[in-house]
């Protein structure tokens, strides 16, 4: 997609080299799609935060679509995603991608719910902890990815065991 529409560039570095490289940035990015965001390292930092926000947005879409998929209304999720792309406050390129995935596989039955992470979310959480900045939405999104990679969760087994032990609640064996 970047090759077709250009790349959003978050450039960090000293002013002189950035000015010298401006023609390259302008060529690679769509109109208003690049910015000098600060000194050395600032570009990577802004990209890290960008990717953390992306994790959170995807998690929100995933949870909302799961709720609709489990509703009693037999909703056409691809149609709803398309609808939301026209004038809704939640419209985005990620929603366009969701609509495409739902058109191809309306209940996502061809996929496993295994979600990898590439590290940016971890780095952002570590930085947030260091700076005493709460990032609960991102933390939930990252931890949900971790959970998606477990075939059996020891924590969930422990919860079942504890509920059974203190209240006689049913367990599955």
Where are these predicted regions, by residue range?
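Active-site phosphate/pyrophosphate-binding segments
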Residues: 34-37
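Phosphate/pyrophosphate-binding betaalpha-module
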Residues: 16-27
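Long, positively charged, glycine-interspersed low-complexity recognition regions
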Residues: 172-173
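Helical "substrate-binding/catalytic lid" subdomain
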Residues: 6, 10, 20, 41-169
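A common structural junction motif
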Residues: 28-32
């Amino acid at each position: 997609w970047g090759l077709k529409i250009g790349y959003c560039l978050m450039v960090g570095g000293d002013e002189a080299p950035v000015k010298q490289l401006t023609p390259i940035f302008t060529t690679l990015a769509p109109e208003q799609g690049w910015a000098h965001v600060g000194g050395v390292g600032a570009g990577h930092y802004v990209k890290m935060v960008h990717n953390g926000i992306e994790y959170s947005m995807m998690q929100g879409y995933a949870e909302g679509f799961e709720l609709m998929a489990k509703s009693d209304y037999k909703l056409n999720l691809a149609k709803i995603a398309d609808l939301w792309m026209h004038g809704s406050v939640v419209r985005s390129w990620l929603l366009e991608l969701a609509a495409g995935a739902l058109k191809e596989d309306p209940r996502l039955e061809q996929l496993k719910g295994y979600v990898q992470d590439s590290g940016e979310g971890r780095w952002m959480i570590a930085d947030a902890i260091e700076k005493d900045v709460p990032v609960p939405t991102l933390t939930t999104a990252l931890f949900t990815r971790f959970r998606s990679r477990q075939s059996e969760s020891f924590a969930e087994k422990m919860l079942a065991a504890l509920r059974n032990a203190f209240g006689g609640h049913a367990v599955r064996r």
